[in-house]
């Protein structure tokens, strides 16, 4: 008897586990859509999202999927900044298959003033079983002009 008969067959309704590259693509799409729900749904329940370069009024980290959801809902909901494009500079694989490092530039507009801005960034994503477990998000939030400036 062949060993293939003993291998488990996934149920047709079972979603495929996303690779780190696929998670990164979904992450960028959530940014473009300004969707805190789509973003948070990429995270494990106990994930941590860190901002090593903090900006005034912005927390240094979110702990847990629901904190990510609430934090981005508040930040994106209050901001007149609209992301127009995420320019993907590079994505680097590491010796750890669950880690991807991505360079990008966010291009957007401040809808209250029609001001264009660009903000370079770097993400280090840890993805386990298709969900983000940790993010180190190196973005200089001061690159986004304020609504009143």
Each model region followed by its residue ranges:
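Short beta-strand edge/turn micro-motifs at domain boundaries
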Residues: 2-5, 118-146
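A short, structured loop/turn motif at beta-sheet edges
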Residues: 91-99, 126-133
């Amino acid at each position: 008897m062949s060993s293939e008969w003993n291998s488990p067959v996934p149920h047709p309704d079972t979603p495929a586990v996303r690779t780190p590259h696929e998670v990164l693509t979904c992450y960028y799409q959530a940014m473009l859509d300004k969707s805190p729900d789509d973003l948070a749904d990429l995270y494990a329940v106990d994930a941590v999202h860190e901002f090593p370069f903090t900006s005034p009024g912005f927390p240094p980290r979110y702990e847990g999927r629901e904190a990510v959801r609430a934090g981005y809902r508040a930040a994106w909901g209050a901001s007149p900044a609209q992301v127009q494009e995420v320019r993907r500079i590079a994505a680097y694989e590491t010796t750890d298959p669950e880690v991807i490092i991505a360079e990008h530039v966010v291009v957007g507009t401040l809808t209250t003033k029609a001001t264009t801005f660009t903000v370079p960034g770097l993400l280090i994503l840890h993805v386990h079983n298709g969900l983000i477990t940790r993010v180190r998000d190196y973005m200089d939030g001061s690159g986004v002009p304020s609504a009143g400036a």
